[in-house]
Amino acid sequence: MKFFLLFLVVLPIMGVLGKKNGFAVDSNGKAPECFFDHYCNSECTKVYYAEKGYCCTLSCYCVGLDDDKKVLDISDTRKKLCDFTLFN
């Protein structure tokens, strides 16, 4: 019973503190364009406060963005490609 109550308390907190991945956008709704990973890592960590970033399909893909950051709406195929590239 104690485990169940603990689970009910921790589950909402995990949802609030979650991070997301995606192409972070500026105030104009555009993601930074890129050719090299080091540019994206700098852009994502310093401008958008993500954990890291890299170049995927000529746009900066940020990993570990806060939930309140806006990301570019993309197809599931493109997102899967960038997530797959990240983990391989």
Curated annotation (Swiss-Prot):
GO molecular function, one term: sodium channel regulator activity
GO cellular component: extracellular region
Residues annotated as domain LCN-type CS-alpha/beta: 20-83
Tissue: Expressed by the venom gland.
Record-annotated disulphide pairs: C34-C55, C40-C60, C44-C62, C56-C82
The protein's name in its UniProt record: Beta-insect excitatory toxin LqhIT1d
Domain of life: Eukaryota
UniProt keywords, alphabetically: Disulfide bond, Ion channel impairing toxin, Neurotoxin, Secreted, Signal, Toxin, Voltage-gated sodium channel impairing toxin
Protein family (similarity comment): Belongs to the long (4 C-C) scorpion toxin superfamily. Sodium channel inhibitor family. Beta subfamily.
Localization: Secreted
Gene3D superfamilies in UniProt: Knottin, scorpion toxin-like
Signal peptide from the UniProt entry: 1-18
Domain notes: Has the structural arrangement of an alpha-helix connected to antiparallel beta-sheets by disulfide bonds (CS-alpha/beta).
PROSITE patterns named among the record's database cross-references: LCN_CSAB
Cited InterPro entries: LCN-type_CS_alpha_beta_dom, Scorpion_toxin-like_sf
Function: Excitatory insect toxins induce a spastic paralysis. They bind voltage-independently at site-4 of sodium channels (Nav) and shift the voltage of activation toward more negative potentials thereby affecting sodium channel activation and promoting spontaneous and repetitive firing.
